[in-house]
Amino acid sequence: MNRTTDRVDVVVAGAGMAGATLSCALAAAGLDVSVIESGPAPQWNGENYDLRVSAINLASQNILMALGVWPTIRQKRISPFDDIETWDEGSTGRIFFSAADAGLRHLGHIIENKAITATLHEKLKQQKHAEMHYGLSVTQCQSNDEEIVVTTHKGRVFRARLLVGADGALSRVRELAGIGLHQRPYRHAAIVGHVVTEKSHRQAAYQRFLSSGPLAFLPLADQRSSIVWSADTNLAEELLQLPNDEFQCRLGNAFQHRLGHITSVSHRERFALVHRHVERYVSHRIVLVGDAAHTVHPLAGLGANQGLVDAATLAEVLIDSANRERDFGGQVTLRRYERWRRGENQLVLNTLDGLYHLFGSGHPMIANIRGLGLNMTDRIAPLKMMFLRRATGLSGDLPQMAKHSRS
């Protein structure tokens, strides 16, 4: 890789899950990639639990296997989940998904975000076609028919065929590209933390739809669970400020003590929930992936998986174009990626919006309808299997990396 002129094939701004996944795939295919990350390199020591976790589905697992990082991630702290149980506070509705019913070993894995990103960064540092630049932020970009010139806040300049914005929900690349954004707050915030429960979670994920918002318990190692409690902003702030013993009591009651008493609770954090989707995924020699393009409500745990599939899809499109000796930073190539992913991501956003409003209503008639819907889905095997395939990520038009396990 030419390290004197900083002339590369692709510049990736942002090295979170989506950006690092894309960079690994491109570098493995022989494209020279410069990765610009505003923060420090992610560190994993295994001592403290990361409050941010992801429910990695089977499609995302396949992507991580294809990159050769899954075995290393497995050596860190991960927890498979074999069952998903969902029930509704306002009705008798309940649905239960089991890996065994679908002939699968697991439905997915709960993994701390730092365990994934740290492993991907370790992989990138081993790639001869990848170069990491920490503590840099993109401040300017200017494109022509041949290339895009990217300037950072420290004056470092990169010349490339393509700039990828993987720099999160507040994307600077998106702003520089002039790409419009549709966004609206959910008027909810999520409280995240870890708890230890009296009873074992039995490798199951649980979600209860409360009138105030969904509450999820996601299995971690031992009898520890990650919690994501979404509530209106006032209630979320109240929950955040409660002493631990009062919070444990409120949480246990909200969860109907499904796993017995909550014996301890970690430090908690709160973050706002916002629906975002860009008007377009591409500009002139610029393309967006992951949270830079879309953010969703966490009630289905799909955000990280969407970003990983974005990355795998864009990698497939770019590598195919490069192999055909076409302009992989040109509009024809980039529009192919946009057509592939925009509709799928919009479907997820619309579905989650619908669920958010459906389960957020306290109207008795709507509560009865959703209870009937949950129970009906639980009893109709083909319908239940359709939802299960959706949950595992194995439906829809997937890139090759997401389709097949390569263990």
Tell where the protein language model's regions lie, with residue ranges.
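Conserved N-terminal helical subregion
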Residues: T5-R7, P71, R77-L176, Q183-A189
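N-terminal Rossmann-like FAD-binding beta1-loop-alpha1 element of flavoenzymes
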Residues: D9-V35
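Glycine-rich FAD pyrophosphate-binding loop
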Residues: A27-Y49
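N-terminal glycine-rich dinucleotide-binding loop that anchors FAD/FMN and/or NAD(P) in oxidoreductases
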Residues: D50-R74
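FAD/FMN-dependent oxidoreductases across multiple families
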Residues: E237-V332
